[in-house]
Amino acid sequence: QIINIDGSGNRLSESLFGPKRVYYVIGKNKIAPDLSSAMDRARNIACPKNAARFNKKTPCVVSDDKKCYDCNSPERICNAILILERPCTGMEVEMVFINEDLGY
C-alpha cells in the first residue's frame, strides 16, 4: 500500500489517472510495518514538518507536541488522503527504494 497526503489533491489525481507510468522514489524512513503505523507517521511526523516548511500556522506546527489535530485551518496541507492498493487500470507503477532517509 502507498499512502499519499495532499492539500489540494492535484498530486493525488495524477497518481490515479493521467500518466501511463508513475514512479515512486521511497526512502527507508517512509516504510512502515502496517497501514495504521504509516498513517500515524504521515499525519504526525511528515505533515507537521512539511507544513512548517511552508510556514503554515496550523495547530500541528504551532503546538509544542507537533502532532496532527485534524484541524479545520484554511492553511491545512493534508486535506486529501489516498491509499493506493494496486495500480489503476492501464497504469504501471514502479517503486524505487533508496536505503537512506528522504524527505519527511
Residue locations for each model-derived region?
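Conserved phosphate- and dinucleotide-binding cores of soluble alpha/beta proteins
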Residues: I2-Y104
